């Protein structure tokens, strides 16, 4: 059974992950593309370096906003980690937030 505390913790984790402009840009890109993308594609599309993209993707993955899978690219002869959005909805209202403190 999921408790109110667990619900609050999951909500806080998602809000924290979405609370950075670059992570919002990553989510927006994945939503627009509507397909799994690998790290280089994401970094190139957003004009950021791979290391920075990876840090933010890890945070989004830990929050359950994106998921990743490793796929062998036979053409390149290496494994690539692809990222895609996990469907999610965030509903916030004063009534919902009131329940948090009760």
Regions found by a protein language model. Name each.
Residues 57-58:
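Short, hydrophobic-biased segments on the C-terminal half of alpha helices
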Residues 1-16:
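Short, Lys/Arg-enriched N-terminal segment that forms or immediately precedes the first helix
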Residues 74-102:
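Conserved segment of winged-helix/HTH DNA-binding domains
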Residues 14-49, 72-74, 79-83:
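N-terminal helix-turn-helix DNA-binding core of bacterial DNA-binding proteins
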Residues 44, 61-62:
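Alpha-helical residues within the helix-turn-helix
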